[in-house]
């Protein structure tokens, strides 16, 4: 049964997410459109919840609650969550299939309109473009005016013609979703992926606890402190708006400090100058403090948390559609500040007590402290502690495994420091972290992080944030790393050649460790060792007049612009996608193993999982780490290791 609903809530869906959205006292379902797959597309039924046909409603509810009937929706998490709240009955994800996730697995846009257009659906099957205005009118509160009689909500009787359009729009969404599903049905989703999505939905439904009293204190103090800093900057500079770059640059020039651009990096550079005038130093320090946008994550926590102080829906399944990794939603847990404070627990204790004066004295400007405390706002359930376990250097391990770089695999098997071992292979001398040739370890580290996916000098610069390696040595480091890793270099070439071959000859090309390239209906597929496939939609070779070479291009969502369009790829990039996809599949198997032991995974970030564990369960860390390090049947010879720790709040060990 295909389902689409239209809803009302005074809570902003985009800001708060669906779980807080349905907790609004005025939340309601307005329209329900549904169809059974044997009805034919002209037979979509629409229930107007203001004037519902009892027989139709009974038919819908009976099917909805029948575990034998599979329900489909585009972004099924929304329909599941709303219908569960509305009917006060559970909506097990095992009974649902998400058409949006299906689209994402094929590299298509994750929105109904975008997916329909990318698939070239005919106009009568596309999403109705009038929808946004109708949602604004009926599904959100309206501003009270004299004209509308000071009402705060539009009902069907306020504009019957618009209401009829809304019903048509709701019906059309089912038509579009069903047509997308029909078009994509030839591409089979592995059952293991459906099971993983169900686990993901249970995890999002359960959520993670937040220390809301602490978050409230931080937001309240930070608002006040930002105002104080703003006023101090105005007083020091005499500027009306010290946030204005143009005004600030003029003022800096008047102080004898020329800065062509005022960015995070240029300010850091300027603050290193011992001769910088004190007044300028203070103004730049204030600007840096005011630029700490990470504090906004606390405000999101306040908007998005549920009544039980849990945050739900923070992970999007298959959100990174090149690799299939999860993406962060609401509070972006994938880009949190590192923990560098000398005593994180003390800083957190001071925040919980609201003693920000002592915090400032001990740790400096609070904006910087707050950015490091974001992780600590996530707390275990009552009577529990967190066990955090992550894969140690998972991408380096997977890359070496698929390439067959034996010396790297052996180093991991023996538990050696991979940065020291890499530097040793590059420079042909022993390298120890705190001993012989230790100065070379940094070169090894930056090279491991920068060079694995065909990265050159540019990638080295991005990874060497501290500028530890002189610029004139960067190319030599790249060359040394490539010389030490011939199997990885060969893998880049093999992947690019495999992609070109399947595009031109429409045949399967197999590489080692179960990786295979194929070409179906104009799309490039890469089969992974797990059996899952990566998809590059509408892949072809395209001549670039700038270099006279044919490049591999496909249609995809641009990571910067978020627009659907042509994207180029090459050997190293394909290797990156494959490596990260295999790392994701390793995490997925470990999550399923941990869940099978009865443990409650509350969230996961990159390659680590955070598990809510009862305090009396003293063996949990050992058992969870063992799950992470256990061999995977489809990856024989891949050395995995789980590193973990226990903590009373989330943190980076």
Please name every model-derived segment.
Residues 1-110, 118, 344, 400:
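Conserved RNase H-like, two-metal-ion catalytic cores of nucleic-acid enzymes
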Residues 257-260, 427-597, 639, 643-653:
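Conserved catalytic core of nucleic-acid polymerases
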Residues 2-3, 74, 95-98, 378-394:
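Conserved catalytic palm subdomain of right-hand nucleotidyl-transferase polymerases, strongest
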Residues 184-196, 586-609:
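Active-site palm subdomain of RNA-directed nucleic acid polymerases
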Residues 1-13, 24-27, 31-34, 42-43, ...:
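Conserved "right-hand" nucleotidyltransferase catalytic core of DNA-directed polymerases
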Residues 616-623:
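Short, conserved charged micro-motifs
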Residues 1, 61-65, 369-385, 592-596:
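A short acidic-Thr-Gly-centered motif at the start of a beta-strand
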Residues 627-635:
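A common structural junction motif
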